[in-house]
Each structure stands twice: as structure tokens, then as C-alpha cells.
Amino acid sequence: LAALICAGALPVPQAQAQTAGLRAFTSDQELATFLKRRARQHPAPMPADLPPPAPTMVMAPSSAPGAANEAVVVTGTRASSPSITNTQEADVDEGGIVKVHGNHLVVLRRGRLFTVRIGDGTMRAVDHVDAFPPGTNGDAWYDEMLVSGDRVIVVGYSYERGGTEINRFRIDAAGRLRYEDSYHLRSNDYYSSSNYASRLIGSQLIFYTPLDLDPYAPIVAQLPALRRWTGKDLDRYAGLGKDGFQRITPATRVYVPEPIRRNSEADISTLHTVTVCDLAAPRLSCRATAVLGSDSSNFYVSGNAVYVWIGEALPGGKGHDRAMLYRMPLDGSRPGALQAWGGPVDQFSFREDRAARALDVVVRAESRGDWMWRPEVSSGDAALLRLPLSAFGNGAYLAPGRAYRPLPLGKQPDWSFHNRFMGRHLVYSAGRFAGEQNEAAVFVVPLDGGLIGRIRAPHGVDRIDIIGNDAVVIGNDAKDRLGFSSIELAGGPPRLGDTSFLPAAREGERRSQAFFYRPDPGSPNGASGTLGLPVTRDLGKSPAARFLGSGSAVAFLRRDARRLAPAGELAAHAETARDDDCKASCVDWYGNARPIFLGDRVFALMGYELVEGKLSNGRIREYARLDFAPTATARK
């Protein structure tokens, strides 16, 4: 990557990129002919490595711990309930395991939805229902949940029914749940170990999903489609077509960049699809836009567009394969594309600068896309790529070498890479997994120019997040202490702030939503506030446990005038766990613990336990505890 940057990449004339978007196919016949001709010219190679197998149903313990004119037009109104989710973009909600609706928490847990009333200063279990359609066996994975108005949406993936499953429920002011309807989107499995499949802006539900293509099968049967489950049986649906699927993408909404269209060696094995569904409609309605490319991808959702980075899109020989970056506007207008080198590590490698109409992307020479476990490892040179949105066109534009800013790395190995944009800075670190080192180099890049700062954190780095106007890096040292170090970004050059350690502890979960920081009401810059994060004291567990969730407590830290101090923990009572008669989605792929801050109240969700704490004099103590686990006899 460094050699390519130094050599420079010559762009096509800027006017071409500014004026031309991607060209769509004119008909199903043209698309089918194109795919068949490409298959004859360039038979698909055997994959370099096999993808992980479909998850096996495991019975886990029941209480296992842009510019304004580009904004998407949405229907309905934004939910008035405060956000309790640590999202990448402030105006874009992400599918999660706990949301708030009025005076109730809504929890998605092991194939069921639960509501807990918290509005009267107490905690009381109200209702629970299956998260899947009535009359089915729940043979699917239900991973994400969102709340829009008086609807609760559960997102899952069904291998039996063939695609992304969307289940809608009604919730009333008393917290009672009622099943409404279910739909399936034709798609591959969406699971990523770090990214989230669904986003919500207003009442618009947004998905990015890949679809494998078979050039010799009927193309109409492979295009994005939606079907509604009728409730009669598993195989009978309402809609068009023999299998009940109704197309939501005509061939005239399938695009391909000109360089890929002309290059018979380019990989076009996957249809990358962005789907927008109107949740406010009595019957779910969706529209989709699709682009062709290889199967290696990362995606990021801003308030205006979905960005999809396709690795190894155009062969260059001797490791010089070029990537294709797509910009797919959420308003349904024509997408654009451009070429680049390398690839992002995860969704946090992206940042849309709406004011400057630009996109920043952190890239490495070798990255493997978003899919299961791939973001955990990357390698090679790193750079910060800045692209004007006007460069997205017909795909002919190749980002020039001057668009990349080389980024320094720490000592080898550097395959565990973490990055986060915050304010006008990029903060990143590269090294081993935390716990294998007693210090880590943290780099701070001023986005407005200036020298890159290098800061030594006295522990490894497994997480980078935002605390007010500053950053926090979290990770273990070789003594099994979990370290929290603030990186002060405001009020002078970036510098190491305060550090606090939790002895004999590790992160209980890796996902971004497991972390939350609430600034104090009188501290708008976040210099004072409270931090929450699931931790585990069981240090003998498999290293993979942190990716699936192994939280045995939620730890809290106080920050006062930028000084960090442990505030205590709210712990799970695993010894009181009982059989929940789990029927579906019985593995916590998205974890099971979250800190929750609502007004001046503080909660810890750990499996089926919801614990409220009271903060006083910098310490948290248990105030109330609720076990909302269902029993076999009480199950609906």
C-alpha cells in the first residue's frame, strides 16, 4: 500500500467522476446475458478459504452472563424515547438487544421479547412473547431489535425459510406486546462479529445484505425480493411468484461500474443490496438498490447513504488488486462508485463529513471484510483516505496517491487493529490482542492537519470509544488487569489522561453497544460522567467468549474533571438461574449484558437479570433486582 501511495494513482478527468453515476441494466434479459457471458469468460475460482459453517443450535445456560439536501426523506416521526444504545452515528439507530419505549424497557433474549416497566421508579416484568411467527418452530436466529413508534421490530436470519426475517410486534402504553406480521428478505446470512445488520432512521428500516449469484440459474429468482408470511404454514406465503417472493429490485435498479463491466476478469459473484423498508406502512413495503462485486465487503451507514467497500474488485496482478467503493444514497437516487487500494477494517473505519461533503476511510493493505470473525485480523500498511463525495461517479475514478495519508504503526505484530473517529480526530491502535502486552501505542490523527501524536497506553487495547470530547482506550495488561485510559483530545495537543485498572477482570463483551458513557448534566463537554461496561471475572474461559458475551457483572467508572476511578459493579446472580425452556436463538451471538442509563437512573442488564443501582459519593450500590426469566409453565 505504501509503495502504491508513493507512486501515486492517476485519476480520470474529474468532470467524468462528477457528472456520471453508475449505469443500470435495461432489462432482466440484459442482466442475465451479461452474467452468463462473464461466467463463460471467467469461471469462478475455488475460494481461498471456506466460510464458517452455519451456527449449530446450542442450549446455553439460561442466564449465561451530507448536505442537507441529501438527507434521507423519512415517514413518521422519530421516537421521543431517549437513546440507550451506543451508536456510531447519533441520528442512526442500530439493531440491538435492549431498547426503551416510554416507561418500559424492551429486551430481546433467547428468541423472546420481554417488557419491563421502569417508569414508576420500580421494576416490574410486564409481558413476554416469542420473537418469531406463531405456529412456527423458531428455527432461526433472532439477533437484533429496534423500536419505531408503537412497533417493535425483530430482525433474524432463517436458514429454513431462506433469508433475513423481519417480525413486527405492536407495543401499547402498558407494555403489552402483540404479534403483527412477518416478512422475509432474500439474502445471505448477514452475521458479522462487529457490525450490525439493521439501521433505523425515523420509520425507515435499512439493511445491507449480500446475495450470492449463480449465472446459470434464472436471474429473476435471485434478485432481491420480499415475501409476507401468512400464518398458514411454513411454506405458504402471500405475494407473487411460486415461492411467494415479490421482487423489490428490477434490473433497472441493478448497477455495475464501467471498469467492472468492461473487465472480464473482475469478480461479480455477489449482488450487494441496500434495502429500505417503511415500517409505518400497514403492510411492510420495501425498495432495494443493488450493485455487482466480489464477496469481500465492509459497509457503513451514515444519515444520507450506505457505503459499501468491495475488496479485490478489479485484478491488478502482483498484489495490486483494486477495490471498488460504492455510495448508495438512502433516497433511492443513482449510486456512484470509485476505485481505491487496500480496505477498511470495520464500520468504524468510515466517517462521512457532511459539512465538507467528504468521506474519510482508514484502510490497511490487507483486510478481509465484515463477515464473521474477519474484522478481528488485518495486516500491512495503514493510511487515512479522504475522498470528496463528488468523486463518486461511474467507477472510473481511481483515488490518487495524494488522497492517502500514511499512518504509522506500532511494533510487530500489528494485526489487532482498532480505530474510531471522534470529533476532528482519528484515534487508532494496532498490536496483539489485549492481555498479551503491558503497553500499547495509541495514535491520534488531527483531521484538520498537523502532526500525528503517539501516546503510550499502560495496557493493551481492545476497545476505543468516546467519553465526552475525549477518547478512552480499554484493554488488559499481562497481569489480567483491565485498564481504562483516557486520551485527552480537547484543550491542547492530544495526551494521555488518567488511567484506572480493575484487577482480575476482562471485558465481558466486545461489541460496540456493550459500552456506554453518560456525561453528567452539568458537564456538557463530558469531563465528568459515568462509564459502564460488562466484565467477566472468569479468566479461564476461552478467548472466543468475549466475542459472544461472557459478562458476569457490569462495571462502572466515575469520571470527575477528567479523573477516572472505579465506582463498583452490579453483578449477576448466576446461581439463581432456572430453565427458560429456550426454543430458538439459544446462543448469545450479540452478547447478553448492557449498561443502561435513563435519566438519573442506572441499570445493568445481565441475561434475565435487570439490576438497578444508585450512585452516591462516586460509588454504585445495588438498589433493586428483577429476574424476568420465563418458566416452562408461564411460557406463552
Q: Where do the PLM segments sit?
A:
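Beta-sheet-rich non-transmembrane sensory/scaffold domains
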Residues: A15-K636
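C-terminal segment of classical bacterial N-terminal signal peptides
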Residues: I5-Q14
